[in-house]
Curated annotation (Swiss-Prot):
Organism: Parasynechococcus marenigrum (strain WH8102)
HAMAP family, alphabetized: Rib_5P_isom_A
Name this polypeptide is given: Ribose-5-phosphate isomerase A
Disulfide-bond pairs as recorded: none
Organismal lineage: Bacteria, Bacillati, Cyanobacteriota, Cyanophyceae, Synechococcales
Lineage top rank: taxon: Bacteria
Swiss-Prot/TrEMBL keywords: Isomerase
Pathway: Carbohydrate degradation; pentose phosphate pathway; D-ribose 5-phosphate from D-ribulose 5-phosphate (non-oxidative stage): step 1/1
Active site, renumbered: 109
Length: 239
C-alpha cells in the first residue's frame, strides 16, 4: 500500500504543477504530497520550462526544500497577491471542507490559502472522507500558557483534546510560531465544520484550528485504476 500511495501522490503532484504558469506568485504547501509538488516545480524551473516564479511557503520545512531547489521565495507580508496556492490535506469531505495540520503548519497554511486567488488541494484517494474527524484528529494551535484552559473549553464542546508530543525530542511539539498543538476528537466527528471552526477560534488562547472552510476551488485526487496511478479532478459545485 505504501508504494501505491507514493505513486498516487506523485501523480497528483505532477498534475498540480501543470496548472502553474510563468510569472505566478505561488503558495507552496507543506507535507509529503506538497513536497513532491515543490520538487516537480524545481525541476521545471531548472529546465527552463517555467520562469519568473516566486513562492510563498507555509512552513520552515517547505522553505528549506524550496531554497535547496533554487525556487525564489518571498514572505507573505512581501506580496500583495498569490495567484495559486497548492497544498495537501489530511481529510477532505464531500463539501470540500478540510482538516489540515498534521504537520502543525495549519496557521500559515490557512493564511496562504485565504490570500490565494485559487486554492488547489492535492491528495491521494485515502484522504477522501464522508465526515471529518472520524479518522483524523483536529489540530488546534494554542498559546503555551493557555493549553489546559483551552483543553477544558474543548471538553465542554464535546471534544477530547490531547497535547501533541514530539517524537524526537522530550516534551511537546512546538509550532513555527512558538505555540503548542492540541489534537482534538469530537464525539461523532464534525457535522458542521463552519460552526465549529468559528466556535473553536473564539476560545481565548486559541490562535487557529485546522478546519479549512469554503477555501478550496479544486481537489486533485491521486488514485490507482487498473494498477496504474491517475488523477481525478473534483471541481467545487456552485450553489
Amino acid at each position: 500500500m505504501a508504494d501505491l500511495q507514493t505513486q498516487m501522490k506523485q501523480a497528483v503532484a505532477d498534475a498540480a504543477v501543470e496548472q502553474i504558469k510563468d510569472g505566478m506568485v505561488l503558495g507552496l504547501g507543506s507535507g509529503s504530497t506538497a513536497a513532491l509538488m515543490i520538487k516537480a516545480l524545481g525541476a521545471k524551473l531548472a529546465s527552463g520550462e517555467l520562469k519568473d516564479i516566486v513562492g510563498v511557503t507555509t512552513s520552515f520545512q517547505g522553505e528549506v526544500l524550496a531554497a535547496e531547489l533554487n525556487i525564489p521565495l518571498l514572505s507573505l507580508n512581501a506580496v500583495d497577491r498569490i495567484d495559486l496556492a497548492i497544498d495537501g490535506a489530511d481529510e477532505v469531505d464531500p463539501g470540500f471542507q478540510l482538516i489540515k495540520g498534521g504537520g502543525a503548519c495549519h496557521v500559515q497554511e490557512k493564511l496562504v490559502a485565504a490570500r490565494a486567488d485559487r486554492f488547489v488541494v492535492v491528495v491521494d484517494s485515502t484522504k477522501l472522507v464522508e465526515r471529518l474527524n472520524l479518522g483524523f484528529l483536529l489540530p488546534v494551535e494554542v498559546l503555551p500558557g493557555a493549553w489546559r484552559q483551552v483543553q477544558q473549553q474543548l471538553a465542554a464542546l464535546g471534544g477530547k483534546a490531547e497535547l501533541r508530543m514530539a517524537q524526537r525530542k522530550a516534551g511537546p511539539v512546538v509550532t513555527d510560531q512558538g505555540n503548542l498543538v492540541l489534537d482534538v476528537t469530537m464525539n461523532g466527528g464534525i457535522s458542521d465544520p463552519a460552526a465549529l471552526e468559528s466556535t473553536v477560534n473564539n476560545i481565548p488562547g486559541v490562535l487557529e484550528n485546522g478546519l479549512f472552510v469554503d477555501l478550496v476551488d479544486e481537489v486533485l485526487v491521486g488514485e490507482i485504476t487498473d494498477g496504474s496511478a491517475g488523477v481525478r479532478s473534483l471541481e467545487k459545485r456552485l450553489s
